[in-house]
Amino acid sequence: MKKFRKVLDGLTTSSPVNPGGSPGCGSAAGTPSAAPTPRELEIQETLMSEHFQICKTVRHGFPYQPTALAFDPVQKILAIGSRSGGIRMYPFLSFPHLGRPGVDCHSQHESGAAVLQMQFLINEGALVTACADDTLHLWSLRQRLPAILHSLKFNRERITFCHLPFQSKWLYVGTERGNTHIVNIESFILSGYVIMWNKAIELSTKTHPGPVVHLSDSPKDEGKLLIGFESGTIVMWDLRAKRADFRIYYDEAIHSVSWHHEGRQFMCSHSDGSLSMWNMRNTAKPFQVTFPHGKTQRDGRKESCKPILKVEYKTSRNSSEAFVIFSGGLSYDKAGRRPTLTIMHGKAITVLEMDYPIVDFMVLCETPYLNEVQEPYAVVVLLEKDFVVVDLTQSNFPIFENPYPMDVHESPVTCTAYFADCPPDIIPVLYSIGAKHKKTGYSHKEWPVSGGTWTVGSQTYPEIIITGHADGSIKFWDATAITLQMLYKLKTSKVFEKPKTGDMGRSADLVEEDPYAVQMISWCPQSRIFCVVGISAHVILYRFSKHDANTIITSLELRLQCEMEDVISPSDTENTPCFSDPSGHSPQPQPPSPRSNTPDSVRDSIPCLKVKDRMIRMPPGYQAELVVQLLWVDGEPPQQITCLDLNSAYGLLALGNCNGLAVVDYLQKTILLCMSTLELYGSADPFQRLTRSPRKNRQSTSGLTELSDNQVSLDLERSKSPTSDHVNGHCTSPTSQPCPSGRARVPGGPEGPRLARRGPGRPPFRKAQSAACMEVSLPVSSLTEENSFSRSRSSSVSSIDRETKEAVTTLQFAESYGRKSDSLPTPCLWVGTSLGLVLIIPMSIPTDEQERQEDPVTVAPTGTVLMLKGSVLRFGFLDCGGALINSPYEVWRDQHAPDDPDRPRKRKLVNFSPSSSQEACGDGHLAVVCSERQAKVFYMPSQACLYVHNITESSFVLRADVVSVSNSVCLACFCANGHIMILSLPSLRPLLDVSYLPLTDMRIARTFCFTNGGQALYLCSPTEIQRITYSQEMCETLGELFTPIETPEAQNRGFLKGFFGGNAQTFDREELFGEASAGKASRSLAQHIPGQGGIEGMKAAAGGVVGDLARARIALDERGQRLGELEERTALMMTSAETFSKHAHELMLKCKDKKWYQF
């Protein structure tokens, strides 16, 4: 049996029988040369399974659809709950070289129910959440990954409000029926003490008071609980006597209640836009009712106002006037008024307008004790799509500059790129350029949310995240040490003229609202050359400069359209090039042909967008140098670009789509190659397909409507082949590009997908083709777009033989061998297609700088073909020692810098040639090729397949990359079924296979990307970026939310005030609510659910030796300090008592012998 297993393992990880090549991975030209066997290579692989572990590190961006807000005033940690059940907690990070960027932590309720309310156990490292499924959860924050310790599910009542007094172990829970229950925080079990609604109100009252909307204990007496009902009824309940002290019946509905710190009065906000003040001495009627924004009309009545949803009533020592802060309350006189937050301080009223509706707000105060002067210093305002903190200590109420990246979603994110271990000087340069455009007027004080600690370990190399957006903007983010700070913003739309009303039709057929949406990004950090692919089938090349420049942008236009026969047979006509017009190769842009040049007004040889053709002043930063656009051909818009690669050392740019491939020399501004995929094969086409020219008119194919209308579950789709589809006789070969497929929609965004408009006479569907550029013109539901893949509808291997179109799915420039007979590596372009074919195109590039600017670059397709299963996704190159071979690059130089005669500006190139020190393989190197189905390692130049591994049979790979981890190299793959797989190189031995996501959606598939150092990221919601690590070493860099901090002591009230005006009675909640006196609650009322993180959380909390010692030390210090203070107070009282006794004795002796009439 063991021998049989070894044979099976050898079939997947061993080299082929014929080391010189096989029909599946051989070449059509050249003579096979001897290739080493895997044993002869003897590459020592250091990576083991123990080096890998999947772990979420940090989530950036604004929480999607926020619902609740909470703050711990001692730990200074902020928490935001969302509609999807997520919790974002915001600790803070401080680095001397990074300033104080924000870091946040994310946790998720497994039920996915919306978070209605949150309560911190102040300075205890715990959080209570109330969810829409009527469940309470207790979260432990005393560990690196917050976990649920207990849950309590209410079965018969719905939770509406929760209140947890400071330093109390009993939680008050109000319900929709008007009842108030009490929960023990430590055991998470209901107490038998219940305040029923019919006991809270008078017996003579016939109507139900409504749900509980407010609960709070009196600052003057903790034994009194104020209960607010929605109908306007307010009850002060005496917890000891189990009866109501007073009841208030008000005409208007109540939304919130806030106490004065002395406990003598409280304020209510109402649905008519009014604020009512109540005095505890006289509760018959409010002693003050105000309409802050209600004007008095001619008839003397107040105009109607919107409800005041929340009010906060806070006092300050420095001012006799209190702060009254509330949201809402504006009059109905103006439609479309922006949401406001009003701050009333004395007679001054300040109205702050917000960009989005207010979800919740909270006033941050200096003390956690409600019976002390509050001293408010900031207001945290949670909006639907933003997060604002207002400084209350300054008269103009400025806002704080937010260290968290809340504007990731300023425009919907359409693509992402992640670069680790960047050049160290790139981040300061980008920051210095971007800092010039930052807003001013922020508060000068430090950000008030300053809790938590975070460690970054030894890996603090520079990291940059680049996001592309639907409006054509590009954002560069500093992602060093799991932070995210905005560095620089680039607007690609400035390259083009604003389209006129009559010219909108050119891009309207391609995209409805966002003609500048970014599909793909290619960046060379060393040379700082940046390329952007837009949805309107255009590529923009940028160079970085620290100086202003006045330049004219060069524009190149390509006719990359081709039509082929539906069914190809060997008896068809000869190959005919589909680019008969040589003008497509002209280095100068062609003038757009007017639409009236044909009787049918067919658009031809015009781009979707018009590039500015005048002198443009460009500020420092990235400056556009070249624009490459694909043209309309015979009334058909260009196919969108599916892949892109640039190489700064070669000065070349390559792009591909569903029709073919183009290579551009951006130094000489010329087009070197513009061919269909079939023309690249020449006579080496393994399927013997033929092109057809001239193009024929396309007919409507109604049978394709089921491609997008039917929502098919992902589980069914995973069992079908993604490599071929048969729909009405046409073949579709999907790919897994990160960019959106087709011209039908712009991906990503809270508003859902944007659909295309069809021009007159256009068929509802184009011919079936590769999914890299599949066009869908019928409406697709947002759920289908985000949560399912429209992949194969049938499985047939023979359909490949009938494939009529082949998309270029990946490109990469490298120093490699274009032919088997080559003895030295030369510049090559590796091309991968949707049929699993790999073409190697050698190039001849002049080495002298002057010749490079003048002599042409020769590109000669040789017909070299390698084959894999599924669309080709990624290339990687290793030397014979197993080390990664990086692509050559040009060192950055500022082309617009002032001329320096001592330092002539010459191109400085850095080459990484394959190592030839290994005698086992001579001068060759290894090529790693990964497709949707399998991965292969070829030895070059013999093109022998040394290793092959079938990655998946039931699903397909969405994203793959060759990355460096722990000073070694591996192949990382992300599959459509949510699995993350790691394979060793070059042996392709599986090291990790984890089901990370149970169900993936198109947003994740479009934005998921790996990078070096064992990290990856994806867009987990329209507004959030999730970063993960698959490295064990990186998993240890998580921070801690809870830090041991001494709880501030209550203020000393003074001897006389405490003796005469204080609360003489002590309130023991344990005695009142405990099982001994209150009994047990009904089991059918709520169900206790032990949390999975209970035992693990206790172990993790107990396992932190340093934290335990620190807590023990603080506890000892607190105990010793309190004992010392007690001793001092005792001595002081004894001294005072002796003094009092002495004075009393002297007074007695003096007055003893006096008569009564002598006094």
From Swiss-Prot:
Membrane topology according to the record: Peripheral membrane protein
Keyword Coiled coil set for record: yes
Classification via SMART domains: WD40 (SM00320)
Comp. bias (Low complexity): 25-37
GO cellular component: cytoplasm; plasma membrane; SNARE complex
Keyword Transcription (UniProt): no
Chain ranges of the v-SNARE coiled-coil homology domain: 1094-1154
CDD domains, alphabetized: R-SNARE_STXBP5
WD repeat intervals: 67-108, 115-154, 159-195, 214-248, 254-286, 307-350, 358-392, 414-491, 519-628, 642-703, 808-865, 874-946, 951-995, 1009-1032
GO terms classed as biological process: exocytosis; Golgi to plasma membrane transport; protein transport
GO MF, one annotated term: GTPase activator activity
Biased composition (Polar residues): 699-713, 721-739
Keyword terms of this UniProt record: Cell membrane, Coiled coil, Cytoplasm, Exocytosis, Membrane, Protein transport, Repeat, Transport, WD repeat
Regions annotated as coiled coil: none
InterPro entries the record matches: Lethal2_giant (IPR000664), LLGL2 (IPR013577), V_SNARE_CC (IPR042855), WD40/YVTN_repeat-like_dom_sf (IPR015943), WD40_repeat_dom_sf (IPR036322), WD40_rpt (IPR001680)
Pfam families: LLGL, WD40
Location relative to the cell: Cytoplasm; Cell membrane; Membrane
Residue ranges of the region described as Disordered: 1-37, 571-604, 690-770
The family this protein is said to belong to: Belongs to the WD repeat L(2)GL family.
Record's function text: May play a role in vesicle trafficking and exocytosis.
Name of the protein: Syntaxin-binding protein 5-like
The species this protein was found in: Danio rerio (Zebrafish)
Gene from which the chain derives: stxbp5l
